């Protein structure tokens, strides 16, 4: 091996590296028994912090779920608001010209 061969070594193509990384991620997700992402508890905590900046919420009245539907993951966040908070949400929605807010 000459010194020039050392400098001419071919680097792996980025597509190959990306494919290998994706295979690792897919294998890791498939191996997880619950199918729940690692980041879900942290995501739930951060979402609750953001919501609590704007509304008073009861943490027991919040649910976060991830559902798989074919090749799509759906993140569902349910927050139960008090009646006064619902009225404020409806008023804000009507001012913005948004569609009616669904009642529970």
From Swiss-Prot:
Keywords: Cell cycle, Cell division. One of its GO terms (biological process) is cell division. Transmembrane segments: none annotated. InterPro entries: MinE, MinE_sf. It holds the Pfam family MinE. Belongs to the MinE family. NCBIfam families: minE, PRK00296.1. Prevents the cell division inhibition by proteins MinC and MinD at internal division sites while permitting inhibition at polar sites. This ensures cell division at the proper site by restricting the formation of a division septum at the midpoint of the long axis of the cell. HAMAP family: MinE. This is Cell division topological specificity factor. It comes from Sorangium cellulosum (strain So ce56). The lineage of its organism: Bacteria, Pseudomonadati, Myxococcota, Polyangia, Polyangiales. The gene is minE.
